[in-house]
From Swiss-Prot:
Belongs to the class-I pyridoxal-phosphate-dependent aminotransferase family. Keywords: Aminotransferase, Pyridoxal phosphate, Transferase. This is Probable aminotransferase TAT4. Gene3D superfamilies: Aspartate Aminotransferase, domain 1, Type I PLP-dependent aspartate aminotransferase-like (Major domain). Its EC number is 2.6.1.-. Disulfide bonds: none annotated. It comes from Arabidopsis thaliana (Mouse-ear cress).
Length: 424
């Protein structure tokens, strides 16, 4: 048997992995859920409960399994039929049409983010990310040793991008601005005029736009969704998407990256070549789901998305009305997309709450209610509330939230805080 004496091992865990994990939404989510009591009142939102997907999507996957069309390895850049189907689907909203060659299939939108960051990263480079924003962009930027610069929003103007903050932080090493549209966690989505302003500014600054559009099927506002790819005649655009949110199938792990490049900039700057090379050395999305993609995208009835939108709008209206009775939290706008409410927390309104992280930890311990802290999205003292529950559970969740805030608050009367949106 080998000696068990002291050995100077020449390996250790990655510091980059530890730093990236600290920025991960999953790290915060796991921590908060772990503080709940499984023997107490029902944990809200329920763990691992998902709404029902489209029967068309289910049947498409079953057919792919039974026919064997998804049994083999797919090309590293994706099945040609899946790539063409995505291009044709996106082309419904585009003047400058895509082909299958412009689309790369990925393992969900997360790998699409990783791909976008990896193929563009260079020494000393920096990228503009939203504050707040979904943290996967931050995680992968940390791994690639990119400098992250956070641009701001204007809450009082329905969370429009603060273009002044963008202009101020760009230098010769900035290569892209990353947007989330529709936005998680703000719950807004951008008008055509605002996106055109962004494209014009990006062109002026010499940077590309990367747009995460995974929530495009979860829009329930009065205005139509406008994809960033519509402005590829002004600036090179990369759009990211997947079926996870629109079809409520995050476990199917299938997404894409699309290059909108009317003027051939991606080819001349070797972005196309880098994308193909990156995908040669990474995992591929399930072939069986790729084989089903054409039917999923083409045949899913529109009323599936309409019913989902009605459900989400109803829950947003309900949750927003309940927040009016919790004066310690401020909701600047009623969301028009996604599945969350985003509220500002002022610790000065509480007796014993230090910040958003402390709020969420204590809420989980006392009420078995999971709300995620804004720090998980890069913004201190904000909270993200899930509304993707049936009404009885949602009512229970907001009653628990209200009780918790009343116990810890220095504010007694609900009327003592101004409602920034008025009665709605």
């Amino acid at each position: 048997m080998a000696s068990q004496g002291c050995v100077d091992w020449q390996f250790s865990g990655s510091d980059a992995a530890e730093k990236a994990a600290q920025a991960s939404l999953g790290t915060y989510s796991s921590e908060i859920f772990s503080l709940c009591d499984p023997q107490g009142k029902p944990i809200l939102p329920p763990l691992s409960e998902e709404a029902e997907t489209s029967h068309t999507a289910e049947k498409a996957v079953v057919k792919a399994v039974l026919c064997g069309t998804g049994n083999a390895y797919a090309p590293s850049i994706g099945l040609p039929v899946a790539k063409r189907a995505v291009a044709e689907y996106l082309n419904r909203d585009l003047d400058n049409k895509l082909t299958g060659d412009d689309v790369y299939m990925t393992v969900g939108c997360k790998q699409a983010i990783e791909l976008a960051v990896s193929i563009l990263a260079k020494p000393k480079a920096n990228i503009l990310l939203p504050r707040p924003g979904f943290p996967w962009d931050m995680v992968h930027s940390i791994y690639k040793h990119l400098e992250v610069r956070r641009y701001e929003f204007i809450p009082e103007r329905d969370f429009e991008i603060d273009f002044n903050s963008v202009r101020e932080m760009v230098d010769e090493n900035t290569f892209a601005i990353f947007i989330i549209n529709p936005h998680n966690p703000n719950g807004n989505y951008y008008t055509e005029a605002h996106l055109k302003q962004l494209a014009t500014l990006a062109r002026e600054l010499g940077i590309m736009v990367v747009s995460d559009e995974v929530y495009r099927w979860s829009v329930f506002g009065s205005n139509p969704f406008v994809p960033m790819g519509k402005f590829s005649s002004i600036v090179p655009v990369i759009t990211l998407g997947s079926i996870s949110k629109g079809w409520i199938v995050p476990g199917w792990r299938t997404g894409w990256l699309a290059l909108h490049d009317l003027n051939g900039v991606f080819r001349s700057t070797k972005v196309l070549k880098a994308a193909k090379e990156f995908l040669e050395i990474t995992s591929k999305p399930p072939t069986v789901i790729q084989a089903a993609i054409p039917t999923i995208l083409e045949k899913t009835p529109q009323d599936f998305f309409e019913k989902r939108g009605i459900f989400l709008k109803d829950k947003v209206d309900f949750g927003y009305s309940k927040l009016k009775n919790i004066p310690t939290l401020t909701c600047y706008m009623k969301p028009e997309s996604c599945t969350f409410l985003w509220t500002k927390l002022d610790p000065l309104h509480f007796v014993d709450i230090e910040d958003d992280h402390d709020f969420c930890r204590k809420l989980a311990k006392e009420e078995n209610l999971v709300v995620l802290p804004g720090i998980a999205f890069g913004q201190n003292n904000w909270l993200r509330h899930s509304i993707d529950m049936e009404t009885p559970r949602l009512e229970d969740a907001f009653e628990r939230l209200k009780s918790f805030c009343e116990r810890h608050s220095v504010i007694v009367e609900a009327s003592s805080l101004k409602d920034v949106n008025g009665v709605n």
